Amino acid sequence: MTEQNEINMPTKYEPSNVEAGKYKWWLEKEFFKAEGNSDKKPYSIVIPPPNVTGKLHLGHAWDTTLQDIITRMKRMQGFDTLYLPGMDHAGIATQAKVEAKLKEENISRYDLGREKFVDKTWEWKEEYADFIREQWEKLGLGLDYSRERFTLDAGLSDAVKKVFVTLYNKGLIYRGQYIINWDPEAKTALSDIEVIHKDIEGSFYHLKYPLTDGSGYLEVATTRPETIPGDTAVAVHPKDERYQHLIGKTIMLPILNREIPIVADEYVEREFGSGAVKITPAHDPNDFEVGNRHDLPRIIVMHEDGTMNDNAGKYDGLDRFVARKAIIQDFKDLGLFIKQEPHLHSVGHSERTGAVVEPYLSLQWFVKMEPLAAEALALQKTEDKVNFVPARFEKTYETWMDNIHDWCISRQLWWGHRIPAWYHKETGEIYVGENEPENLDQWEQDEDVLDTWFSSALWPFSTMGWPDTENPDYKHFFPTNTLVTGYDIIFFWVSRMIFQSVEFTGERPFKDTLIHGLVRDSEGRKMSKSLGNGVDPIEVIDKYGADSLRYTLATGSSPGQDLKFSFEKVESTWNFINKIWNASRFVLMNLDGMKYDEIDLSNVTEVSDKWILTRLNETIQAVTSLGEKYEFGEVGRTLYNFIWDDFCDWYIEIAKIPLYGEDEVAKQTTRSVLAYTLNTTMRLLHPFMPFVTEEIWQNLPHEGESITISNWPEVNEQQMDSKASTAMRTLVEVIRAVRNIRAEVNTPLSKSIVLEIKPKDETYKEILEQNISYIERFCNPEKVTIAFDIEPSKTAMTAVVSGAEIFIPLEALIDLDLEIARLEKELEKWNKEVARVQGKLNNERFISKAPENVVAEERLKEKDYLEKKASVLERIETLKEV
């Protein structure tokens, strides 16, 4: 289809008007729908599924913008491109939100029961899924909604069951009592990477544990006195001579008056503290291992909500931290308290609720990680490894996998994938299967659900129809090409996707993983509610437009680095788009109704035309190459420099000469170059700014229905002319140098000057002589001399450029008497400023009373004013010599 619409671009760029209706039109036309069975080479990206918990933040906007840039570029390059959308059920996060909402109505999930609570959560999901889609639309993401997935969809649930049952049958999923991270607020287990460690100023409590025979006591130290009721031994090092005679004897545990043994174990560090350690197997992972070695009982002393239970004796019912104080007070009352020392130590907190995590003995389900990690690491030694961008993150990933622990996958929640395990009501037999057991009424299903990350780990292939390996999408689009994600979830998600994909598909889940950093504020601080520095991307879009936000996010950082966000940067992008808008309007108003098939570059002879086409092709080359390497910051700078400097500031100004002249052939050639260059530039810019480029492209002479499915520009070697580039670069340098000299002596362009140019060699002499019309047009000289034997006057203003020296006699630039008078007036101003600031600095009262920063600021002003005064004096003296 070849067309050129009537010009329909208002004088002012209004993002809301430009963006209105375009996304809906793109969807109606199915431009983003992947073909799936095409002969085209496939390219796929699955969106990292956002949680259905609320608004998307700037991090999501950044993440998805990068993905959209990649997929739009690939679509234009002729790939069968799939950008697959979807959302995550986000077990603990979503359940917490729904419970908080119910709490406002004084209802708990237990009041509703499991089934009704899950129904309520599905309602929440539907509401927030719509909201998330609206945000995707606002951002302009080219998603294939016909393939949208949700982690609790039937198909994905089948994949989850398949994986669980297979791993269980291989002995890689097991159930057992172990110390896990327990969130007493959410009342669920957490995996290690759902625990945030914070340095807390706590205390070391030194206490006496009396020997049962009354012969003395052992000194123990603890940061968690509330666990004392769960102590079942005191351990010493087997080679610690201080305690050799006590090994095998017993302690009378204070307050509870329970006899516990003194055991020898190499876990104890002799040099740390007293060398005697209380052992609480049900509330500490290291103590759990000691307990196993010595067959010690495991006494759980807390309820799941963090209050003490009846094993804690008199402390039953107290909150754990209240119990801590009560126990210490009782030790003091019994004369068994030695001392309390301040102690900075790392304390685990729940990532979701912020509660202090309790090491807790619990019956949970685990994935045996060592064999799975080994397979994933082996992949990285092959050609088919996952390529980390930047490469340094591969080491981060490998170190994590080398030191991985078994993964606790069960969660004490109602919202999520229920564990496919059933227990026989009479025999206690365990059945694990993809389908329910026969005689279901005789079985009870496990109450727990799976960790959210269990289903997310299958995302790249479960969304493609796996376990049906004959599914067309699975065969065509898997493995995916690129994963874009933040470095903060390499452990949570990236590592798990890799090992699950290797285990179940035998392939990597994605060829590349592009890792970005975090969005920070302009001062480099992490955005958070407590600092009040968070930014809603939709508010930014409403004010500046999606294109401004997208370009700012995409070009504001290099791979792996954090992004400092500021509204000034968005405003700067908005100004850039305004520049593009105004330049486009100028081009369109001067095309004289040109059609696409009337664009003719066969008569290009002008150096400026050859130069802009050369620069255009250099830009195509750079943008394509940098884009392949995900260097979008550099892509942005390349496009900015070409559009703002080369096209707008230089070529359009030069184009006005033939456009406003009488030569019709020159006019038509210039129109062709303008239309061709702007059309090509819009296609290069489109992945970054989809809305405004579609608007401009539709008004330009173009081929096709939409810029979204237009062809990606390719380098045309025949349009590249190195001589024209050298010539134009020389001319631009000369013109800039003359403009700078004019600015320095305050001479307007309207005043003619005498211009003398001394070229470096014959090549530059020829360039300058052949293109003297450009110098005459943009420098306004009454006379130009280009020669090797120029002898400049002593007062000539000079400049050196790469191919020549430039001289402008000063007397030809300005009216000397008027300029001296103006400078003397300026000198008077600086004399007053110097006197004022020195008056302050010579005032002892000011120096002694004013804050240091204020005094320092005044000293800086003094330095600045003295420099300006000296500069003006020097110029006056120079002019007087003339």
UniProtKB/Swiss-Prot annotation:
One of its GO terms (biological process) is valyl-tRNA aminoacylation. Its main location: cytoplasm. Catalyzes the attachment of valine to tRNA(Val). As ValRS can inadvertently accommodate and process structurally similar amino acids such as threonine, to avoid such errors, it has a 'posttransfer' editing activity that hydrolyzes mischarged Thr-tRNA(Val) in a tRNA-dependent manner. Monomer. Belongs to the class-I aminoacyl-tRNA synthetase family. ValS type 1 subfamily. ValRS has two distinct active sites: one for aminoacylation and one for editing. The misactivated threonine is translocated from the active site to the editing site. The C-terminal coiled-coil domain is crucial for aminoacylation activity. This is Valine--tRNA ligase. It comes from Listeria innocua serovar 6a (strain ATCC BAA-680 / CLIP 11262).
